[in-house]
């Protein structure tokens, strides 16, 4: 049973109510996600596909924004209901990316000594306030598929390089997946992370490193086994899964990823564009191929007995590029062209593989909507991916507007959703949800100054207060413990989830310890600016905080309205139970407990304690933790 109790619970008079709140609620996260018995009863407006132009209620708008952004706000709910789903998505796709590296470079130009902490503060600030919410949310999802991490000796101090990779993901979140794969393959930071940076062709003593070749196949594209468009397994005559590649295929791919390193600057100066013999290079531009170190042999890709002939690709041998031909000669140009064209052919072969559509569609659905999408849901999205030649914008649109994603009826058993629908909210998404719901702003800044690039003189840095979130939450933006992310898409929590053969990825980082550390950290984040049980506010200088204007006038003197609005902003109308205004004993479920706490356990003079205490209680509750 998930019953997190904060170690800080006695620092205010409401703290003693928290344990009772959680205990009385008594909801198992596992069962609420995995064992719902509801039948799939679509709302009438979805009977023949997605037909509703606009959300019918604020709650439906808030639920959509929970999936499509880092959390709904009062303004974003109103905007979505005004323009409708399609226009909202179109507007988000058209909104330019909020970038990280140029902003931090502007801070560095003022003499600030930067680190990964500044990158994290910028990430959290963008998640909480940036206008390109869908783009940033999809980029976050992609960062958990195309994993790069600062938890690596080569990148731990490279805040600028990791920021550049974040910008690659956000800038290309709605473009071609094939183009994004190429940018990832040529990222110097990815090259260092998965060791194809300065990877050399075979010699008498060495062979090409195979790390990136293996991961671009297993994790970034086709996966380990063949799948149908609906993500179901394709099996052989003995009923066994069929592998998509073997060691021989990895070896062939590894030979392609040789000769790539940091590009020469422009102008090249002393940098040799053919051999790369220099210490002068561009740290952020896509890696360039240096033909002297690129493998020139012929290569056979996907050459497995199980691979359909259409997927087999043979790359011819290259020209005589070693020793280096005369500078500027036709042969030198042929060598450059061979190296670059071979990479293009390989990326195209990967992107065109039929396994990419169901693999990527399934993972993006998991990150945005539900851990266990139906076969039909995956196939519908995969068909859009394939028909659009891997257009991520079209794919994300299909994910969000699919009938399975949009079906939700708070009054129906299981919300009228398919059996086993939903997912555990990722820890970072829990934080951004309550930050956005109540307009959190960073320390040291009034808000708008941080949107200028370069920042005006006198602006120092964004202070959101989460420099090491992996300690409390087991999650850190672009800081996974390995290339397999914080959790794996096919993780099955032991017990009822595994017995039902369901997936529960986010549960891989939830345990007794993180439940408590997360609850404690959320307390500190919600109560930022208050100390020692006092309701006197002191402006934080190192942490995000809720402006008093957001808290002091929030349904002042109207506890019923407060419960309803909290239910809307944080839980899109999904809060269980009911309450009877003015009657503390008649309530049921989470609504009843919360109303009783606000109406009967606190005085009207405790407005800040009411609002902040309620936000904290909801943020650590099992019902909030499950996204439905």
What function would you assign to each model-found segment?
Residues 1-22:
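N-terminal secretory signal peptides that target proteins for export/translocation
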Residues 24-36:
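Bacterial N-terminal signal peptides
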Residues 43-52:
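Ser/Thr-rich, Pro/Gly/Ala-heavy low-complexity intrinsically disordered linkers and tails
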Residues 53-98:
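N-terminal mature-domain "stem" immediately C-terminal to a signal peptide or N-terminal signal-anchor/transmembrane
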Residues 81-84, 93, 104-105, 116-124, ...:
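Active-site substrate-binding loop specific to GH73 endo-beta-N-acetylglucosaminidase modules
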Residues 118-119, 129-137:
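Amphipathic interfacial helices
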């Amino acid at each position: 049973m998930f019953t997190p109790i904060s170690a800080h619970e006695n620092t205010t008079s409401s703290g003693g109510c928290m344990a009772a709140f959680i205990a009385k609620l008594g909801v198992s996260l596992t069962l609420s996600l995995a064992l719902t018995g509801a039948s799939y009863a679509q709302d009438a407006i979805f009977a023949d596909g997605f037909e509703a132009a606009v959300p019918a209620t604020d709650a439906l708008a808030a639920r959509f924004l929970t999936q499509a952004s880092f959390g709904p706000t009062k303004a974003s709910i109103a905007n979505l209901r005004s323009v409708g789903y399609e226009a909202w998505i179109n507007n988000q796709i058209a909104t330019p990316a909020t970038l990280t590296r140029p902003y931090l470079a502007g801070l560095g130009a003022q003499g600030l000594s930067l680190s990964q902490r500044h990158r994290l503060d910028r990430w959290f600030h963008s998640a909480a306030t940036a206008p390109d919410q869908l783009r940033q949310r999809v980029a976050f999802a992609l960062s958990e598929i195309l994993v790069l991490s600062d938890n690596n000796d080569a990148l731990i101090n490279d805040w600028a390089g990791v920021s550049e990779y974040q910008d690659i993901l956000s800038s290309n979140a709605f473009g071609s997946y094939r183009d994004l794969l190429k940018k990832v393959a040529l990222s110097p930071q990815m090259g260092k992370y998965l060791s194809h940076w300065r990877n050399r062709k075979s010699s008498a003593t060495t062979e090409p490193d195979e790390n990136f070749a293996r991961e671009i196949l297993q994790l970034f594209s086709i996966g380990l086994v063949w799948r149908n468009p609906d993500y179901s397994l394709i099996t052989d005559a003995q009923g066994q899964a069929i592998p998509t590649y073997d060691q021989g295929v990895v070896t062939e791919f590894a030979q392609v990823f040789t000769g790539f390193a940091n590009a020469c600057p422009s102008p090249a100066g002393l940098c040799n564009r053919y051999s790369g013999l220099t210490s002068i290079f561009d740290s952020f531009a896509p890696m360039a191929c240096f033909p002297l170190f690129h493998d020139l042999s012929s290569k056979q890709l996907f050459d497995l007995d199980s691979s359909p002939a259409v997927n087999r690709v043979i790359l011819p041998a290259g020209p005589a590029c070693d020793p280096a031909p005369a500078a500027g000669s036709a042969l030198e140009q042929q060598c450059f062209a061979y190296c670059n064209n071979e990479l293009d052919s390989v990326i195209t072969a990967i992107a065109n593989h039929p396994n990419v559509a169901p693999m990527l569609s399934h993972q993006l659905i998991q990150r945005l909507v539900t851990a266990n999408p139906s076969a039909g849901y995956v196939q519908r999205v995969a068909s859009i991916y394939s028909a659009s030649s891997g257009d991520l914008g079209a794919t994300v649109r299909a994910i969000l507007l699919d009938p399975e994603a949009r079906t939700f009826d708070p009054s129906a058993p299981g919300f009228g959703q398919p059996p086993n629908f939903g997912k555990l909210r990722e820890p970072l998404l829990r934080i951004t949800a309550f930050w956005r719901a109540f307009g959190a702003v960073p320390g040291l800044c009034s808000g708008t100054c941080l949107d200028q690039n370069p920042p005006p003189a006198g602006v120092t840095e964004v202070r959101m207060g989460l420099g090491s979130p992996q300690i409390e939450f087991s999650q850190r933006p672009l800081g996974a413990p390995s290339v397999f992310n914080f959790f794996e898409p096919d993780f099955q929590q032991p017990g009822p989830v595994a017995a039902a053969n369901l997936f529960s990825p986010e549960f891989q980082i939830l345990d007794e310890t993180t439940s408590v550390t997360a609850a404690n950290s959320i307390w500190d984040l919600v109560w930022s600016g208050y100390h020692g049980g006092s309701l006197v506010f002191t402006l934080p200088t190192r942490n995000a905080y809720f402006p008093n204007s957001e808290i002091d006038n929030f349904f002042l003197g109207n506890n019923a309205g407060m419960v309803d609005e909290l239910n809307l902003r944080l839980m899109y109308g999904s809060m269980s139970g009911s309450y009877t205004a003015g009657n503390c004993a008649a309530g049921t479920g989470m609504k009843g407990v919360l109303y009783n706490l606000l109406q009967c356990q606190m005085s009207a003079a405790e407005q800040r304690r009411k609002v902040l205490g309620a936000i904290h209680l909801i943020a650590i509750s099992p019902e909030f933790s499950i996204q439905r």
